[in-house]
């Protein structure tokens, strides 16, 4: 019997999305970003499905070590860099690249005793003002890294966009100009583009693109949908009806009697809730896909269940599947109803949700 709830992950969708991004940025190599457990899709599952990617981007060393232990041989890059001096021998032993963005990391590299140099991607703060060396610091920092025997040469260069998911916002052009002026004529790879950069800002594509959310079939732009770019949702979040009940006009449902029926109807109870990562704040009207149609959530989402209005003439049965998001119901649409972003929905699923390749 199939587990419920479950996240069905489509290997063919992941491979399609990688192909779409390669076509979009045909001159660039692809560093598939698989941090946060492959955006909730399963770290090793995703990496194996995307084995033709040129490299993988991760947030934490533990993620990179898991991929190496799972047999992944491709280039790995720690997008936040290393945090402790004791991380450096592990980077060397497992051939893992690191971002450098802070003085403390440079000091650790200068003081370390390593068997071979570490491959470094120097992050430039071109305007996001979160991580990276400022334009004023760049020349001095670059010179220090060049002088450091523990840093492999050439040094690679990167930045990150603040507003690339706003196609009408020209701040991305400002960031590109800042980065390109600073790094002109320097050797090494350059990477600027995230998913939004790859899809909307072709001049940002550089030697490598770093797509994340688009690999999973989701558009990075609010109000857009991955299907508009030929992307296919890689996750179907599925549960089932565990009760179907006749419900009278004037009767409330759920904690706090938050919703009251205006007319006689039939309600379905779906076995998923905030204990599984489905947001408690999903408002009335948030869609769920049941037997080929959208039905609205009514009442409050509870820990293990949510309730939907199936309609007065519904013929749905206990055991019928309910799709919370996926191919028939884009996660972007669900996120818009809830007032969040698709990134948050797919990455917040809890271990109670079985993740399985479909």
From Swiss-Prot:
Source organism: Shewanella sp. (strain ANA-3)
Documented EC number(s): 5.1.1.1
Keyword Protease found: no
From the Swiss-Prot or TrEMBL record, give the protein name.
Alanine racemase
Molecular function via GO: alanine racemase activity; pyridoxal phosphate binding
Reactions catalysed, semicolon-separated, are: L-alanine = D-alanine
Q: Which Pfam families match?
A: Ala_racemase_C, Ala_racemase_N
Q: Which cofactor does it need?
A: pyridoxal 5'-phosphate
Q: One GO cellular component from the entry?
A: cytosol
What does the organism's lineage look like at the top? Answer: Bacteria, Pseudomonadati, Pseudomonadota, Gammaproteobacteria, Alteromonadales
Active-site residues, record numbering mapped to chain: 35 (proton acceptor), 255 (proton acceptor)
In the record, N6-(pyridoxal phosphate)lysine modifications are located at 35
User: Belongs to which family?
Assistant: Belongs to the alanine racemase family.
Q: Which residues bind substrate?
A: 130, 303
């Amino acid at each position: 019997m199939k587990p419920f709830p479950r996240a069905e992950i489509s290997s063919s969708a992941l491979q399609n999305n990688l192909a779409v991004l390669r076509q979009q940025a045909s001159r660039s190599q692809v560093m598939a970003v698989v941090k946060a457990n492959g955006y909730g899709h399963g770290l090793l599952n995703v990496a194996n499905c995307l084995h033709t990617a040129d490299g993988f981007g991760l947030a934490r060393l533990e993620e990179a070590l898991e991929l190496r232990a799972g047999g992944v041989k491709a280039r790995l890059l720690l997008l936040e860099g290393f945090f402790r001096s004791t991380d450096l021998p592990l980077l060397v032993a497992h051939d893992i690249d690191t971002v450098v963005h802070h003085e403390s990391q440079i000091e650790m590299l200068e003081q370390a005793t390593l068997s071979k140099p570490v491959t470094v991607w120097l992050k430039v703060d071109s305007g996001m003002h979160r991580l990276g060396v400022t334009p004023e610091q760049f020349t001095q920092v670059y010179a220090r890294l060049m002088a450091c025997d523990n840093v492999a040469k050439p040094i690679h260069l990167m930045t990150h966009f603040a507003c690339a998911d706003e196609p009408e916002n020209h701040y991305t052009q400002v960031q590109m100009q800042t980065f390109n002026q600073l790094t002109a004529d320097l050797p090494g790879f350059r990477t600027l583009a995230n998913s939004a950069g790859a899809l909307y800002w072709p001049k940002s594509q550089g030697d490598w693109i770093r797509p994340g959310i688009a690999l999973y079939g989701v558009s990075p732009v609010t109000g857009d949908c991955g299907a508009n770019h030929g992307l296919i949702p890689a996750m179907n979040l599925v549960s089932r009806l565990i009760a179907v009940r006749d419900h009278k006009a004037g009767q409330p449902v759920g904690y706090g009697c938050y919703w009251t029926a205006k007319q006689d109807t039939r309600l379905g109870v779906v076995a998923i809730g905030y204990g599984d990562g489905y947001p408690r704040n999903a408002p009335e009207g948030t869609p769920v896909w049941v037997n080929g149609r959208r039905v609205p959530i009514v009442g409050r989402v509870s820990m293990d269940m949510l309730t939907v209005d199936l309609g007065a003439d519904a013929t749905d049965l206990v055991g019928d599947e309910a799709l919370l998001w996926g191919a028939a119901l884009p996660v972007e649409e669900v996120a818009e109803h809830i007032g969040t972003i698709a990134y948050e929905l797919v990455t917040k699923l809890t271990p109670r949700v079985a993740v399985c390749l479909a």
